[in-house]
């Protein structure tokens, strides 16, 4: 356990391909029953229970939020809209997209912030490009993306 300033570095749990398959099902299906997860990944229900208990104890699964397993990332995408842009229309469109949990209209330098969950930085880049291309020219003036490092 090494302390680096106010952040405590913890060793990352070892997650194999079966664990990743289970995590993928959980990410897509929330709290799917063990039997359904077992069918989808091709193992017994008991194996799924054992693996999930181990991942819970290791902190990979916490409150049924997947964290620090090398699967997925969460980002906050702040958008500043151009003059005359319909903030509600833009927010409503983005809010319905896969990978976007929600979109808030906010005060401050930005007008909107989208809470985004994607597999990796490549998927994040694709989503950002999709946002820019979906908006009519001039509707988005800038974006600023912040990666979430930890959820408490």
What positions do the PLM features span?
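A compositional/biophysical signature of low hydrophobicity enriched in polar/charged and small residues
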Residues: 1-152
């Amino acid at each position: 356990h090494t302390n680096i300033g106010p952040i405590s570095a913890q060793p990352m749990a070892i997650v194999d391909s079966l664990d990743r398959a289970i995590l993928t099902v959980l990410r897509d299906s929330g709290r799917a029953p063990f039997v359904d997860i077992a069918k989808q990944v091709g193992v017994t229900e008991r194996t799924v229970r054992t693996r999930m208990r181990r991942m819970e104890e290791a902190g990979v699964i916490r409150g049924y939020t997947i964290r620090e397993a090398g699967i997925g990332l969460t980002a906050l995408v702040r958008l500043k809209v151009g003059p005359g842009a319909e903030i509600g229309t833009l927010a409503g469109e983005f809010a319905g997209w896969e990978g976007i949990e929600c979109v808030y209209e906010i005060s401050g330098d930005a007008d909107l912030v989208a809470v985004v969950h994607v597999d990796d930085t490549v998927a994040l880049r694709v989503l950002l490009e999709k946002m820019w291309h979906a908006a009519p020219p001039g509707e988005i003036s800038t974006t600023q993306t912040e990666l979430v490092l930890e959820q408490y």
